[in-house]
Amino acid sequence: MKTRIFIGSSSEGIDVAKRIKTFFAPEYDCFLWTDDIFRNNESFLETLVKSASLFDFGFMVFSADDKTTIRDQHFESPRDNVLFEYGLFLGRVGLDRAFVIAETDAKIPTDMLGITQTRYETIVNSKGIKVATDSLESSLQKLKKQIDENVQLGHLGLLPSTVIAISYFEGFVKLAAEWLVENTPELMINNHKFNKASLKIVMPESLDTDIKRSAMMYYKRHGLEEARIDTKHRNYPIHFASKTEDGILEVYDMPTILTGIDKAIDMYFRVGHIGKTNEQKLAEDHEMNNFKRVLQLLINEDAFCRECVEIIEPQP
């Protein structure tokens, strides 16, 4: 699951928006405001209000579309609605996640001069059409480094999945990893001795199904045995595969706590229907991706977890 980027612009700036999408597409899931992902009867304003629940980052293209006169001086400026929409998006997601990509000739309001901006130059081609030069991609390369860093550092939003990932890590993963590391070698489970152990966290394919039942089916399909472990804080049931001839223990866990995300999304969208809208599916994928990213960051910061914990996708 890739990090998601929303790209907004005026109608005149759509070609620039498409180039931005092409640039980031190899490593990010990019969506233009013109893409068919929102309800037909929903305004762009409503779309932006929901954007914080659907996307990780937002780009707004400030193309020089209008003429503005300020104190008898004439300037080219972005459309008023684009400025408003950026301000709304910024208020929803914050400076670390909302970015301006502006044409060099576009006059930006003085209140926004402190905001980091990515600039690009334009020329008029042989057909008399104003187009962005290669300076766009050069500037986007610098922006990408900033986005990549934000993702790697884990600039977290106040999403349900962030809280759930932290709870799952502190309440199970961290304790289980500590128990596995401290008790190996010479670890005994069900009368078998193991010299090496690992914890594999199995991400469910989606939130569409009953995760508890999906977990039970996964454990059964892979012939996993059941046992209990006594950590310093509580007793946990586990499912494991044993390679007794090699002395290797593999513990598997599918985080059923993710069911809470599905319920939170249903409440957010005030679900009164059967099935999933595109917006619900986007929100679910976004939350799943964020859960996995936050959990991986927490694993990377813990010495015991780095030693034995791995996040995996379900195997058929």
Curated annotation (Swiss-Prot):
Region described as STING domain: 161-316
Instruction: Give a GO biological-process term.
Output: defense response to virus
Task: List the cysteine pairs that form cystine.
Answer: none
User: What Pfam family is a match for this entry?
Assistant: prok_STING
Q: Where is the TIR domain?
A: 4-121
Give details on activation and inhibition.
Answer: NAD(+) hydrolase activity is strongly stimulated by c-di-GMP, weakly by 3'3'-cGAMP, very weakly by c-di-AMP but not at all by 2'3'-cGAMP. Self-association of TIR domains is required for NADase activity.
Alphabetically ordered keywords of this record: Antiviral defense, Hydrolase, Nucleotide-binding
The kind of enzyme this is, by top-level EC class, is: hydrolase
Q: Which residues bind 3',3'-c-di-GMP?
A: F172, P237, D253
EC number(s) per entry: 3.2.2.5
Instruction: Spell out the molecular function terms from Gene Ontology.
Output: NAD+ nucleosidase activity; NADP+ nucleosidase activity; nucleotide binding
Catalysed reactions listed for this entry: NAD(+) + H2O = ADP-D-ribose + nicotinamide + H(+)
The record's comment about this protein's domains reads: The N-terminal TIR domain mediates NAD(+) hydrolase (NADase) activity. The cyclic nucleotide binds in the C-terminal bacterial STING region. Upon binding to c-di-GMP the STING region closes around the ligand, which is bound by residues from 2 adjacent subunits. STING-STING interactions are the main drivers of filamentation; rearrangements in the STING domain allow reorganization of packing of the TIR domains, forming the NADase active site; cross-filament contacts strengthen the assembly.
Q: Which family does it belong to?
A: In the C-terminal section; belongs to the bacterial STING family.
Q: What does this protein do?
A: Effector protein of a CBASS antiviral system with NAD(+) hydrolase activity. CBASS (cyclic oligonucleotide-based antiphage signaling system) provides immunity against bacteriophage. The CD-NTase protein synthesizes cyclic nucleotides in response to infection; these serve as specific second messenger signals. The signals activate a diverse range of effectors, leading to bacterial cell death and thus abortive phage infection. A type I-D(GG) CBASS system.
| Assembly notes | Forms homodimers; in the presence of c-di-GMP forms filaments with an ordered array of parallel-stacked subunits.
Name recorded for this polypeptide = CD-NTase-associated protein 12
- Please report the organism this UniProt entry assigns to the protein: Lachnospiraceae bacterium (strain RUG226)
Question: What gene is this protein translated from?
Answer: cap12
